[in-house]
Amino acid sequence: MDQLQIKDLEMFAYHGLFPSEKELGQKFVVSAILSYDMTKAATDLDLTASVHYGELCQQWTTWFQETSEDLIETVAYKLVERTFEFYPLVQEMKLELKKPWAPVHLSLDTCSVTIHRRKQRAFIALGSNMGDKQANLKQAIDKLRARGIHILKESSVLATEPWGGVEQDSFANQVVEVETWLPAQDLLETLLAIESELGRVREVHWGPRLIDLDLLFVEDQILYTDDLILPHPYIAERLFVLESLQEIAPHFIHPILKQPIRNLYDALKK
């Protein structure tokens, strides 16, 4: 992909763990590579399809100096986060933050951290069977947007019977396709935080819930950890999930089963 490179932007700020760093301040140096499609900007002279690197450098300087953080990891992360927020056309970003005056009392050129993130497509299943179900789904989607997660597509809301054998009210279910620069684990933690904010209490496994947010796919990632399994292990067994998926992404290929969603839906429906 096309790349914009900004190298060694110098800024003076008051980041650091030691009191002297927060009182006296020091120099920091930022370099970054931003990846996005430059075709439209290059061929049509369309400035809206480009990143104004002068304005970006000014924004970085302002953002960098408006707080005093203990760790340079925090500052670097915030620069990446806000760059993605202000420049939606950026698809990938690699940022290095150097701290040449780091108080290590030894001879060195610099200390630095590098953060590398890229946007990914993900699919999230939403469900609710308590209170105003459709309003709960809408609130969850609004909270995703508020966290900088771009909603690409929304399926219709389906009324479905509960899954898992626990007697309870019917569900309102939906699937959304999103674009986010958050890694899969961070995206999962975001979903859990939204559930908590909306009042979900985990008491009965597969029991009633005010809101349920399940991470189905993140691109074609295959992942197995104590906290997260990708793809979601029950996709091929849940007709309501497949029905919503095939509405918005019928040709998406399940990375383990190697079949498009449309085929999985047709097979389970029979």
Curated annotation (Swiss-Prot):
Binding site for Mg(2+) 1: 212, 214
Membrane-crossing residue ranges in chain numbering: none
Residues engaged in binding Mg(2+) 2: 212, 214
Binding site residues for substrate: 21, 53, 72-73
Region called HPPK, residue ranges: 120-270
CDD domains assigned: DHNA_DHNTPE (cd00534), HPPK (cd00483)
Entry keyword set: ATP-binding, Folate biosynthesis, Kinase, Lyase, Magnesium, Metal-binding, Multifunctional enzyme, Nucleotide-binding, Transferase
InterPro entries named among the record's database cross-references: Dihydroneopterin_aldolase, FolB_dom, GTP-CH-I_C/QueF, Hppk, Hppk_sf
Record: residues binding ATP: 160-163, 171-173, 192-195, 200-215, 227-233, 238-240
Region (DHNA): 1-119
UniProt GO molecular function: 2-amino-4-hydroxy-6-hydroxymethyldihydropteridine diphosphokinase activity; ATP binding; dihydroneopterin aldolase activity; kinase activity; metal ion binding
Family according to the record: In the N-terminal section; belongs to the DHNA family. In the C-terminal section; belongs to the HPPK family.
Protein name: Bifunctional folate synthesis protein
Organism field: Streptococcus pneumoniae serotype 4 (strain ATCC BAA-334 / TIGR4)
Gene for this chain: sulD
